[in-house]
């Protein structure tokens, strides 16, 4: 079980982008979260029993923070990588796909994506990051685990056919396979 001290130390070591990734994976969205907001969210999840040590470890792994796995959780990142290759993820294929796309888009792509969807999202909530854009689109029911058409359309508009194909490939198994809940261990 992750202690409050470990959670606070993890939170202190994460940058703004990493904080957003961890919260996205945990199904909590706070755009550009502050340290206090992240600590509060992690504590609340722990108190609710929704944040376990293995879940935190996979979050940090997916956020690319192998240093924190090693230094704070005392896990060998290579061990965790091998373990995750042989077991189901805590996260849905949709979350992992969104995270993959987030890592592949440059700042210019994200600005273009936001500009192209400005009429759809509206001016009251202008996203600053890709994950914030995803959150806005999900709130409008235009994007979700069973509907990635808007994302693929936007990637096509950005001339990122490479990413569009990757999304199709990553989500293809999910959309055509058995029910969503059978693909991953649980939704945090």
Curated annotation (Swiss-Prot):
GO terms for biological process: regulation of apoptotic process; symbiont-mediated activation of host NF-kappaB cascade; symbiont-mediated perturbation of host apoptosis. InterPro entries: DEATH-like_dom_sf, DED_dom. Pfam families: DED (PF01335). The keyword NAD does not apply. Interacts with host RIPK1, TRAF2, MAP3K14, IKBKB, and IKBKG. Interacts with host CADM1; this interaction is essential for chronic NF-kappa-B activation. Plays a role in the modulation of host signaling pathways by acting as an activator of both the classic and the alternative NF-kappa-B pathways. Thereby, initiates an important range of cellular processes to promote cell survival, proliferation and protection from apoptosis. This is Viral FLICE protein.
